[in-house]
């Protein structure tokens, strides 16, 4: 088995979508960075890699057995054994996984560029391990609270976070079924549509607003998000957390 040593990780917990597991250049000063003293490295095929990176589903039992108790974390000068922790690659993508004792990839992290390069060199002439696992026959369903990667492509960490906050606010707005309110918000988004929305029903206006807002990210998106979350303590807190950040 291959091993990496002194690996810096920045865990993102409970992320089913790989786009939310930030690459090194998006790490922040207040992120909690940990040091893996030793961690096993596995090469798998692209299908299994994508499954691990973009799902929160059960890992192959044989894979868990292969990495069991083989990773150590360095904390306060102590070397602590980890239950199921490993780095996995298909030769293109690379991700570190810690199940925190479960059989699903609860915590995920990217590596720093120097260590990514080391992984590529180590696995270049290595055959991918074969593990049996169940792939869902149906394609993964994305929805407003778990957006498709296509909707998030090209955005910075801050933009992704704010876009997901906007979607959460729009989802909550959908539960109100308040036609006057949705007409107001669509007019905020597009003042020229004032006359048009007066003759539309709630569901049609909401669907049109979501359809237009899900593309890209701009000052217009940010303004709508800020106005929608105003007066809602939980959403306001999320907004403030992102806007305290000076970068990303």
From Swiss-Prot:
It comes from the Bacteria. Belongs to the UPF0736 family. The lineage of its organism: Bacteria, Bacillati, Bacillota, Bacilli, Bacillales. This is UPF0736 protein BCB4264_A1231. HAMAP family: UPF0736 (MF_01860). It comes from Bacillus cereus (strain B4264). Pfam families: DUF3603 (PF12227).
